[in-house]
UniProtKB/Swiss-Prot annotation:
Organism: Nitrosococcus oceani (strain ATCC 19707 / BCRC 17464 / JCM 30415 / NCIMB 11848 / C-107)
Listed name of the protein: Translational regulator CsrA
Keyword Cell division among record annotations: no
InterPro entries: CsrA, CsrA_sf
Gene3D superfamilies cross-referenced by the UniProt entry: Translational regulator CsrA
Family: Belongs to the CsrA/RsmA family.
A Pfam family recorded for this sequence: CsrA
Gene Ontology cellular component annotations, sorted alphabetically: cytosol
Cellular compartments annotated: Cytoplasm
Subunit structure: Homodimer; the beta-strands of each monomer intercalate to form a hydrophobic core, while the alpha-helices form wings that extend away from the core.
Length: 85
């Protein structure tokens, strides 16, 4: 694991097309912004895990598109405070 230190307003690059920017720090929470092409999916870890579980469960029931998993996972996800989430 690469460990980096960033201040509010500073960013890091992942490859040539993904930028992660520190937007703010409040207590033990860090707000980040991710800029990535539309074809790159970006999920919170718990949402990604839910999508993967649903994909595994659906394997026996037939094919379902990733967008259907993503939409269902977002509907079931707990709300996060702040704009743009």
């Amino acid at each position: 694991m690469l460990i980096l230190t960033r201040r509010v307003g500073e960013a890091l690059m992942i490859g040539d097309q993904v930028t992660v920017t520190v937007l703010g720090v409040k207590g033990n929470q860090v707000r980040i912004g991710v800029t990535a092409p539309k074809e790159v999916t970006v999920h919170r870890e718990e949402i990604y895990a839910r999508i993967q579980r649903e994909k595994e469960q659906a394997n026996g029931r037939g094919q379902v598109s990733e967008s259907e998993f993503t939409e269902e996972a977002f509907r079931a996800a707990p709300a996060i405070s702040g704009s743009g989430e």
